[in-house]
């Protein structure tokens, strides 16, 4: 009884079973494609480039040169709470994101790098709408977007070498509220899901 499954196939099963047991749930606030990954272990036909903005964006990036390969080096997976917290602290320790002026292009590069090196599908870095502070929808991500004070903007724009295409010189053109935003680390976001309190409507399907 059991046929061909009885001996040879059972060899790797304990490791697979353990991996399944340890698989963490997707963090609150990730997108539909990540929910697919959580439930099915793959992105299904319900999330394609035709009907999912994150899938369409990713497909477009694969045809563009961004300085590193876009295809993940590791298995594709949804962002988890623990991974978001760990990534936040890693970036804080390494520096470079804190106080950096936000632009969609910079966010895209960060998302692609994380997708390529860690395999996290890039539909997790979303924020509450403005005006004012934008809080991360993904619970565990400890970076919020904070409007830059006018004095700081003036100071940054004083330098003669400031490129007209630098995010600080675009005066919030990327932002629906026309605010210039910067990434700001806030460790409390690991314990307090502000976005869920402010916008419970975004989490109805979580």
Curated annotation (Swiss-Prot):
The modification Phosphoserine is found at residue 6. Its main location: host cell. The lineage of its organism: Viruses, Riboviria, Pararnavirae, Artverviricota, Revtraviricetes. This is Protein Nef. The keyword Secreted applies. InterPro entries: HIV-1_Nef_anchor_sf (IPR027480), HIV-1_Nef_core_sf (IPR027481), HIV_Nef (IPR001558). Belongs to the lentivirus primate group Nef protein family. One of its GO terms (cellular component) is host cell plasma membrane. A motif (PxxP) lies at residues 72-75. The keyword Lipoprotein applies.
């Amino acid at each position: 009884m059991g046929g061909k499954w009885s001996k040879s196939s059972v060899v790797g099963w304990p490791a697979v079973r353990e991996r399944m047991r340890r698989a963490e749930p997707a963090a609150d606030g990730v997108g539909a494609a990540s929910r697919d990954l959580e439930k099915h272990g793959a992105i299904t036909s319900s999330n394609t480039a035709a009907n999912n903005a994150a899938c369409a964006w990713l497909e477009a990036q694969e045809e563009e040169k961004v300085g590193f390969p876009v295809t993940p080096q590791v298995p594709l997976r949804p962002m988890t709470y623990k991974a978001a917290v760990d990534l936040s602290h890693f970036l804080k320790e390494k520096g470079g994101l804190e106080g950096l002026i936000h632009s969609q292009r910079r966010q895209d590069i960060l998302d692609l790098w994380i997708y390529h090196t860690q395999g996290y599908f890039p539909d997790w870095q979303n924020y509450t709408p403005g005006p004012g502070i934008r809080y991360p929808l993904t619970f565990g991500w400890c970076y919020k977007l904070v409007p830059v004070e006018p004095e700081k903007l003036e100071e940054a724009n004083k330098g003669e070498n400031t490129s007209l295409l630098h995010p600080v010189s675009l005066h919030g053109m990327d932002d629906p509220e026309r605010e210039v935003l910067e990434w700001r680390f806030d460790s409390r976001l690991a314990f307090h899901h502000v976005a869920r309190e402010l916008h419970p409507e975004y989490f109805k399907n979580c």
